[in-house]
């Protein structure tokens, strides 16, 4: 592990929020609520749970030279997880709009150079706003939401046929359970008893069109998943000990950790924006100044305490 990598999940989660907030301030907007809700989830994965190949130091992202095709250079965002191995874990990120949060987590973990965020969403950069298979931390393009769980199932089945023992983790959002492909994937995972698949779900109950329960309710989610043959743990998504225990618990079945989270966690001034939290774009200079003050007086102070 790189010497400057953060190894404590609680510290890493705070660093993720701080980096995303700084980026949002510098760019007049961003997916801040996703960082608030998922910081502990990604921190637990990268700091405690995932068994990845060691990293000699933070890497710079490759340039985007051409769309995938014959003769085009192949760039995989999975290189930031180190060399794959039969006993090592894989992580498939499903909600590609969480890309900024994933980049922040990789920086905290010492796997991505912090200057990478200077390339965010720029022409010719792989550090995209919506992550793709060439973006840091993304092994696959998960495109429309709900595709990654199926992809992870195929990866896990292939690994079983190769007698590999490593696990395949999936980071998901709760809105994906409004889509049929997710449930087809759960059914297949259970049928093939792919117990090396472990999904952690950011249940922040918020989506692009507003609160989940005003669009399409998904509860009782745990009951539904169990009926499909999966094992389930429901936990406080900001409790790193509970998250780690749930992610590591062997069950003999595909396992889902439903992490119930708060999309304003760590940045309570966002509550004034409820119920619309999906993407933060400052409405005027006054609002931006309020967030700047919070960043300087709370988030930055907390990083030095």
Where are the model-predicted features located?
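Cofactor-binding active-site loop characterized by glycine-rich and histidine/acidic residues
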Residues: 20, 36-191
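Generic beta-sheet signal
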Residues: 89-91, 166-170, 197, 252-261
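Conserved thiamine diphosphate
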Residues: 164, 213-246, 300-302
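A short alpha/beta connector and helix-capping loop motif
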Residues: 179-204, 254-260
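Short acidic, glycine/serine/threonine-rich loops at helix termini
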Residues: 103-105, 132, 181-183, 209-213, ...
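A short, conserved beta-to-alpha structural element at the edge of catalytic cores
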Residues: 192-217, 221, 234
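N-terminal capping segment at the start of a domain
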Residues: 13-29, 202-204
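Glycine/aspartate-rich loop-and-adjacent alpha/beta segment that forms the canonical ThDP
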Residues: 66, 224, 240-305
């Amino acid at each position: 592990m790189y010497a400057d990598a953060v190894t404590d999940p609680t510290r890493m989660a705070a660093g993720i929020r701080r980096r995303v907030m700084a980026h949002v301030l510098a760019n007049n907007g961003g997916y801040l609520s996703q960082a608030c809700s998922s910081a502990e989830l990604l921190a637990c994965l990268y700091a405690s749970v995932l068994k990845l190949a060691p990293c000699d130091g933070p890497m710079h992202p490759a340039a985007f030279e051409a769309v995938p095709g014959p003769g085009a250079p192949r760039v995989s965002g999975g290189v930031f997880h180190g060399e794959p191995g039969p006993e090592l874990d894989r992580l498939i990120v499903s909600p590609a709009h969480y890309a900024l949060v994933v980049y922040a987590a990789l920086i905290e973990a010492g796997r991505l150079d912090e200057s990478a965020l200077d390339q965010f969403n720029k022409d010719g950069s792989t550090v995209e706003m919506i992550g793709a298979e060439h973006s840091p931390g993304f092994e696959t393009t998960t495109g429309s939401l709900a595709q990654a769980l199926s992809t992870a199932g195929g990866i896990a089945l292939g690994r079983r046929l190769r007698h590999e023992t490593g696990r395949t983790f999936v980071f998901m959002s709760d809105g994906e359970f409004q889509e049929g492909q997710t449930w087809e994937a759960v059914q297949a995972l259970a049928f093939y008893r792919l117990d090396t698949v472990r999904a952690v779900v950011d249940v922040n109950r918020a989506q692009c069109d507003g609160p989940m329960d005003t669009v399409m309710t998904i509860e009782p989610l745990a009951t539904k998943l169990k009926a499909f043959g999966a094992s389930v743990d429901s936990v406080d998504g900001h409790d790193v000990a509970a998250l780690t225990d749930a992610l590591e618990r062997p069950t003999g079945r595909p396992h889902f950790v439903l992490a119930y989270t708060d999309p304003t966690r760590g940045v309570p001034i966002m509550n004034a924006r409820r119920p619309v939290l999906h993407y933060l774009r400052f409405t005027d200079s006054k609002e931006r100044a309020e967030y700047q003050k919070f960043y300087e007086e709370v988030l930055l102070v907390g990083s030095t305490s």
